[in-house]
Amino acid sequence: MRCPFCAHDDSQVKDSRPTDDGAAIRRRRQCEGCGARFTTFERIQLREMTVVKSDGRREVFDRSKLERSISVACRKRPVDPARIERLATAIQRQIETSGDSEIPAASVGGMVMDGLKALDSVAYIRFASVYKDFREAKDFEDFAGAVSEAGRDG
């Protein structure tokens, strides 16, 4: 594995263990060139998935991009990083087991919205503001009002 610090080609695995949910192997590595330590994760990939964007472009599904989007929505919120990891894993599994090799970006966004709704209402509204492309404050007010009403009803 190439070192992210010095780009040396070889590193030595110092420790391996499964993640809490068992969906990945966490490996601590040490670069044989500069001695820096870093962590890698090994996950099963059932098949390569393609995300179809709204403008028709196609991108290879990128789990780190999914996790980053969820993390940005949850920034400065009392959400445990392990819960973000579990949500990303659940969405990835749902996509991989769907039976399709291509999935619309809107479907992925909907899955994230559903997951964030159960995780944290503020993160849910933050993600929705980007996903649904809110243009003005009234869009926020209307959406937040609907979320608040749903919370009282449910």
Curated annotation (Swiss-Prot):
Residue ranges covered by zinc fingers (unnamed): 3-34
Source organism, top-level taxon: Bacteria
Domain ATP-cone residues, every copy: 49-139
Keyword Zinc-finger: yes
Compositional bias annotation for Basic and acidic residues: 7-22
Phosphoprotein found in the keyword field: no
Keywords, comma-separated and alphabetical: ATP-binding, DNA-binding, Metal-binding, Nucleotide-binding, Repressor, Transcription, Transcription regulation, Zinc, Zinc-finger
GO MF, any single term: ATP binding
Single GO biological process annotation from the record: negative regulation of DNA-templated transcription
Chain intervals for the UniProt region annotation (Disordered): 1-22
Cofactor note: Binds 1 zinc ion.
Cofactor: Zn(2+)
NCBIfam families: transcriptional regulator NrdR
Family under the similarity heading: Belongs to the NrdR family.
PANTHER family, A to Z: TRANSCRIPTIONAL REPRESSOR NRDR
Summary of the function given for this chain in its UniProt record: Negatively regulates transcription of bacterial ribonucleotide reductase nrd genes and operons by binding to NrdR-boxes.
Protein name: Transcriptional repressor NrdR
